[in-house]
């Protein structure tokens, strides 16, 4: 039994085979890092701007892409790829620069589309106009991070934008029929389980194309590392997180693609929680919890319509 709709199955439906994302660092930054909004960046984010450790930042986008494709092709015998502009904010630059970057991403013959990670406050109409060109030209997936809909938390973690800006950006992008995803983090400082579920209940009715959920991880060198080591930042327990994810999946529309349910990383970059180094085991526990309940993704989505 399939308990939720996976990103792999979604891409297979579109392209007829397994498609792999190649993470890229375009050398950009974020408006909450460079002082446009605030300085310092998100308090959970490391110096790579949430980019994958496999990214070779010293290389050009073309070389990053070629190196990444060669690595993934060798490991998985893959044939099709998405250029994934992952690190930092990939719509935070003049349109001419962004166009050059996206064009390089699409220039490889085995690249079948783009994934672009960004923020809600970096999607003005000019940027959306540019993205519309690529939406018409290729497979375009726009990932708009929000993490939580609670403004007090967004301020506490130094996001530099509000929940209202997120909802506005989603509305404007959906009018252009973009494929949209967002990211949620469970376990942010000061948030209760009720807060996390309130975020899920606010996001679910948007009927985004896809959703990422993961636990708060403490990365080395981040402001959150200092808080955690000082005992000021409790983290979710493993079983608690499993239960919360199962609760969330039940509320999410069954057609929404689930891109991620557990964050993972290496001990070189993450200090806690310990269980984040066992992604496969946690995924199995989430499925086992849904099996125990006799539920799956979307089982309780109708509740949201009734309460609305």
Annotate the PLM regions.
Residues 68-72, 123-137, 168, 197-207, ...:
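Short amphipathic alpha-helices and their capping/turn segments at secondary-structure boundaries
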Residues 1-82:
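N-terminal [4Fe-4S]-dependent radical SAM core
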Residues 1-20, 210, 218-308:
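Auxiliary Fe-S-binding modules of radical SAM enzymes
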Residues 72-74, 102-109, 129-139, 171-175, ...:
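Acidic (Asp/Glu)-rich catalytic clusters
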Residues 164-223, 239-264:
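Conserved C-terminal portion of the radical SAM core fold
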Residues 20-24, 81-83, 114-116, 140-144, ...:
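Hydrophobic faces of well-ordered beta-strands that scaffold small-molecule active sites
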């Amino acid at each position: 039994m399939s308990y939720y709709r996976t990103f792999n199955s979604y891409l297979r439906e579109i392209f007829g085979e397994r498609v792999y994302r190649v993470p890229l660092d375009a050398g950009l930054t974020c408006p909450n890092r460079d002082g446009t909004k605030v300085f310092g960046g998100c308090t959970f984010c490391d110096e790579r701007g949430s980019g994958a450790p496999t990214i070779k930042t010293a290389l050009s986008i073309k070389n990053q892409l070629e190196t990444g494709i060669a690595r993934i092709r060798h490991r998985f015998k893959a044939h099709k790829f998405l250029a994934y502009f992952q690190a930092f904010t990939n719509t935070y630059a003049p349109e001419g620069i962004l166009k050059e970057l996206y064009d390089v991403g699409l220039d490889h013959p085995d690249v079948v589309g783009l994934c672009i990670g960004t923020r809600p406050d970096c999607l003005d109409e000019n940027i959306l106009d540019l993205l519309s060109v690529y939406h018409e030209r290729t497979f375009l997936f726009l990932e708009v991070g929000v993490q939580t809909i609670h403004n007090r938390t967004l301020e506490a973690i130094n996001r530099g934008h509000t929940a209202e800006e997120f909802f506005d950006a989603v509305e404007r992008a959906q009018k252009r029929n973009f494929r949209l995803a967002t990211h949620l983090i469970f376990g942010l400082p000061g948030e209760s389980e009720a807060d996390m579920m309130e975020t899920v209940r606010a996001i679910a009715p948007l009927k985004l194309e896809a959703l990422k959920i993961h636990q708060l991880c403490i990365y080395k060198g981040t402001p959150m590392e200092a808080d955690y080591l000082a005992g000021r930042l409790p983290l979710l327990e493993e079983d608690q997180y499993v239960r919360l994810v199962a609760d969330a999946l039940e509320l999410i529309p069954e057609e929404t693609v689930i891109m991620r349910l557990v964050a993972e990383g290496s001990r070189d970059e993450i200090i806690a929680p310990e269980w984040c180094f066992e992604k496969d085991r946690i995924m199995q526990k989430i499925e086992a919890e849904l099996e125990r309940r006799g539920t799956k993704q979307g089982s309780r989505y109708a509740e949201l319509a009734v309460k609305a």
